[in-house]
Amino acid sequence: MGSEMCIRDRAKIAGLKMCESFNLQYGTNYIAVMPTNLYGPNDNFHLENSHVLPAMIRKIHLAKCLNESDWGAIRKDLSLRPVEGVDGTASEGEILSVLHKYGITGPSVVLWGTGKPLREFLWSEEMADASVYIMEHVNFEDTYQKGTKDVRNCHINIGTGKEITIAALADLIVKETKYQGKVIFD
């Protein structure tokens, strides 16, 4: 996953720089926006490749289902989103094995890291609203100080300005899902 993140980060930076360069070289009015961590409708909840918030929600949900022996809910979840080919028709042993691989058991759920990093999250529809607002009200020349020799970093960061620790986010998910097990950070 490290190399995927590196490629994705480089692609984002290249896109930002492309907009900036076109504006300077050709007089276009492209505005590049950089969102914070997004979540919302049609999010990716696959354990193999989801982002932090949907991964935590799903892991804690599945741990709760295991803790309560709610095999109907577990099978429904895995039928919608199989994990490593294990779907809702698999045996309990196969299901337990694959979930355990991802740190999901009934009594506990393991989340990556220390829980201390701060992250900012934004509802995807609010990101869309902010993008439309920027298209209608902001010009490239508004993104840098006039008379500056080097025009750089002309993108606009979009977020809430409110950060939360991963541990506090996990606590919020635990509270909302009413999970009675333990969250462990590795």
Q: What positions do the PLM features span?
A:
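Short, small-residue-biased leader/transition segments that mark boundaries at the very start
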Residues: M1-I7
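Phosphate-handling active-site elements
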Residues: G2, Y26-G27, T143
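Conserved sequence/active-site signature of Rossmann-fold short-chain dehydrogenase/reductase
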Residues: L38-G40, M127
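Active-site Tyr-X1-5-Lys
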Residues: R8-T36, V52-E68, G72
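C-terminal substrate-binding subdomain of Rossmann-fold SDR/epimerase-dehydratase oxidoreductases
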Residues: L62-D186
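Active-site loop immediately N-terminal to the catalytic Tyr-X3-Lys motif
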Residues: F45-H46
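A short small-residue
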Residues: M34-L38, L111-W112
